[in-house]
Amino acid sequence: MRKTHLAIIAFILSVHLALPASGAPVTQSSNGWTVTADGEHGVLTVSRDGLGTVLNEVHLNLEGEHRLTRLKSWSAEKLGADRISIRSSEPRSAWEFKLRPEALEISTTSSEGLLTAETPAPPDRIVARLMDPQGAPVNWMMTPETKNGFGGIEFSAPSFLPRHNPDVMYFALGQVAGNSLHSLFDIKADAAIEFSEQTVMQRQPQHTGVLGVSIPVPGNTMVRVIPDYFTKVLGAPTYVPFDDSYFGRAPMVWDSWSSYYEDVREDDVVRNADWIAANLKAYGYEYVQLDDGYDRGPKGEHYWIGTWNQEKFPHGPKWLTDRIKSKGLRAGVWLVPSAYAGAVEQHPDWYLRYKKNGAIILDYDTPTLDSTNPEVLDFLKKEFTTLDDWGFEYYKFDGEHDFLKYVPGVDLDKIADKNVDPIVAYRNRLKLIRETIGPHRFIEGCPAGTPLDGIGYFNSAFTGEDPYNSWQGMYSVFSSINANAFLNHLVLYVMPGESDVEPPMSFAEATKRRPPSVVEAERNREEPLKGFGMTLEEARTVVSHVALSGVVYSLDSVLPELPEERVKLLKMTLPTMPIFPIDLFSRGTDMPMWDIFKHSTPDDYIHNYPEIIDLKVNAPSGVYDVAAVTNWRSGTTTRSLGFADKLGLNAQSSYVVFDFWAQKLLGVFKSKMDVSVEPHDTRVLLIHPLSLTPQVVGNSRHISGAYSIKSVAWEGAKNRLHGTSETVPGDDYTLWFYVPQGITLGQVHASAGKQEITARHEVTGNSLRVSFPGQREDVNWEIVFTAKSAM
């Protein structure tokens, strides 16, 4: 039956039939809905206030066992103030559209009713899997630090795992669809459009902004609109659609914190920046961010621009940013704008105070500023003007607690403006900073307790615990993606924490090669601490999950010490891609504090991490799925990957599967494949619908298969497949092709500009591998085939 629906949708998207006249159009508007029934052309249109068209070219059909009958002769009339009735005579049936406040209810006298239609689905109206209130309950918590560290208010919201495929997490690169996806999310309106679970939506390349929709009506069905989805359903404190015009994808940033802590020195930053410039800049890496440790006073207090440690940073901040920029990179800095130690004596009224007196010092050994005071805002404007003049382009704001709202004990009678709402005061401070540095500077908010009240001003938010440099330490990264990926690229970018890919290092060796503060921090979080680093399989899982979810790609490793095999993992997963979540719900914040690993190990830990990540791709490289299958346990496992059930693909089709990390074409599979995964490893499989002609199925450059390929085209008259790829100079580039039986290789050519490039090739069965050295200019490649029969 689903196969029939897909064929119907393809037909609808390609042609519209003119039907016999059956009366003038009838329009009914009620409860925000407008339905127009045009009997003359046999179509209906459905729109919704604030959303525009929801369904267009709606046709009424009756579905038999082997055929579909479109109703060609019907009449419509209004019933009361909120209904439209439709009656057909060939064949006889009756339909009713009832315009309810949050749903369009559709019913028919036939048990075989079927609506076929188009629904607008431009880039700002994305396919989605919505929260399922009938699924397993979990808790989304954004304030563990405020509650546990300061006795403050806890912010949390209920969420639910889906009943169907709770082990799969879906993402989109480009305008995609899937048979298991039945809803849309309108980014501008913060509204979801939910169809029935039996609905099939399909997108065709020639109609990228439209989805064909097939909606079974076995008696009745509903099309629901869920307004204020992020705020009222998910529990976000505010909703502002993310403007990605300056930052079209999540940034890639090296952060000094987890590998150096407050012991970081100028030489450490320069050494890592030089290494990034030499090894990763060509792959898209761009930011080098200095974290805490550059300005501490004798008691650990902070002065930010006032007192840089001259012993650790002898050349000062301007020299450092210039040095980073000279390498073609961008400089970033960590600070806590809500606190400052330099004005306690001169301006005591600048500070928040306890009801029992005394300045509030809750974090970073630094007193907290009163953001309702205009003089404080003037000070912050001067501070950020100076930082911007020094050349910083990336700002990590820590301690974003919004003390007035979430921390008890503040004496509200002693703040400058007693009438201002705490959230308004907090956002006014962020607004001033944003206006000072401009929209082209990146701000990472480290809420550490504030439930995302900075949405609209932050470009990203650090939404997890500080990671540390081991496999267990990376669980904070996985937990953050697991809990918060639904926010990514919709309201801000998710910064899940710094990733580490260093190889194993014993505790004894770490005491010699790492600062004491780093060793001590890890020992306090994990008992017993066996060492640092992780296996190659574990590192592969880290970079796979970060890259395929589209979150901020932040590194904390001592990069110059990485062996080539680890560097290769980074190169093959950079840069970040403009990925959107499909799953619009939290999978639960299940690790609030690091104490858990003092009593547990990852193998014992019960979590809701996905076993499969499914990135659906629609790009010049093709329309396909990237499935990452992860084994979280310490024993080898085999998982069954059902193409229809798990990935929402067509159950009747065959698929070509390419193993990205193994760089190997695995063959053609019909309905499923069994995937063997080593302990803590992730297999990444590119799954393409099988074509009758030669097709690109993978490349060596990027895990998505999409980044480097700018165009691909098949010319049947010439038996010629050609395309254009962006490559990295000096780095060997490989394309993998599937060649159907009966087709043989003729010639392979590659060129950059006017220069011919030597292209090597190897044929093994149906697999064709073509390699050539990377160039500064785009590489145009072509492959000519010969066929035993017409293609």
Describe the predicted segments one by one.
Residues 223, 668-706, 764-791:
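C-terminal beta-strand-rich structural cap/linker in extracellular carbohydrate-active enzymes
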Residues 346-378, 382, 424-564, 585-588, ...:
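Glycan-recognition surfaces
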Residues 7-18:
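Bacterial N-terminal signal peptides
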Residues 250-254, 258-385, 392-415:
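Aromatic-lined carbohydrate-binding/catalytic grooves of carbohydrate-active enzymes
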Residues 25-29, 35-287, 311, 394:
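Carbohydrate-recognition beta-sandwich/jelly-roll modules
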